[in-house]
Amino acid sequence: MIRENFSIGTEIKEIVIADLVLILAFTLTLEGGIGGISMPYSFVRRFFYLLPIVALGVTLSFVLHELMHKFVAEHYGAIAAFRVSTMGLLITFATGLFGFLLGIPGATIIYTSYFTKKQNGIVSIAGPLTNFTIFAIFLALLLLLRPAPSSYTYALISFTIFISILLAFFNMLPVPPLDGSKVLGWNKSVYIATMAVIFVLMFLFTGIPISSIVFMIFIALLFSLFYRNLM
C-alpha cells in the first residue's frame, strides 16, 4: 500500500526514487531490454548516450506533472503528497528489463472528503496541461535553435517533446485512476477538446503508429487493474 506520511523530506525522497527508477526503466526499454545485452559494448555505450536524454524528458514530464497535481489540490485546501508504491517500482523496473514499460512507480495521493467534481477535474487536468506546456516550450526551442538532426541537442529537445505529449495522452485516457477519467466525469466538453488537441499534436510531432496507441490503452487497463488491487 502507499503509505500515509506527509513529511516533506520523505516526499522528496520518494519522488526522486520514483523518477530514478522510471528513468532507468525507460532507458532500458529504449535499449530493447535485456535482449540488447547480447552486444555488451554497444549496449553500454548506447545506454549512457540515452541516459541524459531520458533523464531530462522524464524528470520534467513526470515530476512536474505530479507536483502540479499536488499544488492545485493544496490550492483547494486538500492534503496532497507524492507516494511511491514498492510493487509499482518493481513492476516499472521489471517491465523495462523486458523491453516494454508499465511505468507506475507512484502517484500524488490526495486526501480530502469535500472535493466537488469540478475541483477534482481541475486538479486532474493540471498534470496533462503541464505536459502540454513542456511540449510547447521545447517545440518552440526546437524551432528557434534549429539544431542539426544528428546533434545531441536535437536528441535532448525532441525526446522531451515526445515524452511530454505521450504522457499527456496516456494520462488523459478515460480509465480510472488516470486523470482522463476524472476530467471526463467533470466536463465532457473540456475532456473532448483537450484530448483532441493532444491527439492531433501527438500524431503531427511524434509519428506514433496506431499499434502504439493500442498498446498504451492496454497498459492503461493493466494499470487500472493494478490500482484496484491496491485499494
List PLM regions with ranges.
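Hydrophobic transmembrane alpha-helices and their immediate loop junctions
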Residues: 1-231
